[in-house]
Amino acid sequence: EKGYNASRNALQTVPLLNAIEKNKFDCAIGGARRDEEKARAKERFFSHRDEFGQWDPKNQRPELWNIFNGRKHIGEHFRVFPISNWTEMDIWQYIYQENIKIPNLYFSHKRKVFERDGVWYADSEFMQKKPNEIAEEKIVRFRTIGDITCTGAVFSEAATLEDVIQEVAASRTTERGTRSDDKRSEAAMEDRKKAGYF
């Protein structure tokens, strides 16, 4: 895609599907959670994908208690999401409890950003700015880290894990609320998943 709101999701999907096919993987493990987005709320722990890597929300296996159905045909695979039932708060509390090192982007820092349609994007060579979009230095952090072309920052003073946990507890916006690729349509994530996106 080209233009001001171009998405690079297709560039991520094709290599993923090629690697799964080439290596004949039975599954790929991901960190998606049901609380992130409504299409992911439909996702199973063992999420069936057809021989083209596509997701069909109507063709998912029942999961009763902790019993998972890993039966598949040749060429099909599963995306397995072991932390599917965790929340954003669960993640941050676990990181804090286990003292896990994480990228600095998750903490507040000074960065040049510009606003487009209510989302503050990092000023970067990968972003084509409109003439009226002026980069300003702000104190921000990223609640979710994805492609720079679709991931927005939030204004934040959260410089420690404790600060982040307090901020998440008080937040009124969703973790993916600053992802422009989710705002393309009501079914944007579901459409990407049907095409093979993780």
Regions found by a protein language model. Give the residues of each.
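Nucleotide-activated chemistry modules centered on ATP-dependent adenylation/adenylyltransferase
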Residues: 1-198
